Amino acid sequence: MAEPRRGDLWLVSLGAARAGEPGKHRPAVVVSVDELLTGIDDELVVVVPVSSSRSRTPLRPPVAPSEGVAADSVAVCRGVRAVARARLVERLGALKPATMRAIENALTLILGLPTGPERGEAATHSPVRWTGGRDP
């Protein structure tokens, strides 16, 4: 099996879905940093599931067929999770840098991570503001 890298698109066995989670076999983007994928703690891989839904928002950036999905899709950033490396079934492709930036921006918002000058300090709130409608 190929080694996963940050920005790769993999078919992942997520198992049965619960409470709105994406489930079953589906594409997912590897968002773990490469150093963690080859280090001591390499059994878990952090991924963002991908859905063929066309409901795009800043929290669901588009993923194009040229990046490895079968049809226009979205990265479901609110579904970010760690999975066992054994759940990675097959490498499908790699995302373009602009797509990864959109996913990183969404994760920054969802996780309340600091940006800019306050980076490195504990965040008490997200510096990025959600101004769009409902994110399903």
Curated annotation (Swiss-Prot):
The keyword Cell division does not apply. It is an enzyme of class 3 (hydrolase). SUPFAM superfamilies: Cell growth inhibitor/plasmid maintenance toxic component (SSF50118). InterPro entries: PemK-like, Plasmid_toxin/cell-grow_inhib. It comes from the Bacteria. Its EC number is 3.1.-.-. Residues 115-136 are annotated as: Disordered. Gene3D superfamilies: 2.30.30.110. Keywords: Endonuclease, Hydrolase, Nuclease, Toxin-antitoxin system. GO terms for biological process: mRNA catabolic process; negative regulation of growth; negative regulation of translation; rRNA catabolic process; symbiont-mediated perturbation of host process. GO terms for molecular function: DNA binding; RNA endonuclease activity. Toxic component of a type II toxin-antitoxin (TA) system. Upon expression in E.coli and M.smegmatis inhibits cell growth and colony formation. Its toxic effect is neutralized by coexpression with cognate antitoxin MazE7. Probably an endoribonuclease. Forms a complex with cognate antitoxin MazE7. Belongs to the PemK/MazF family. This is Probable endoribonuclease MazF7. It comes from Mycobacterium tuberculosis (strain ATCC 25618 / H37Rv). The gene is mazF7.
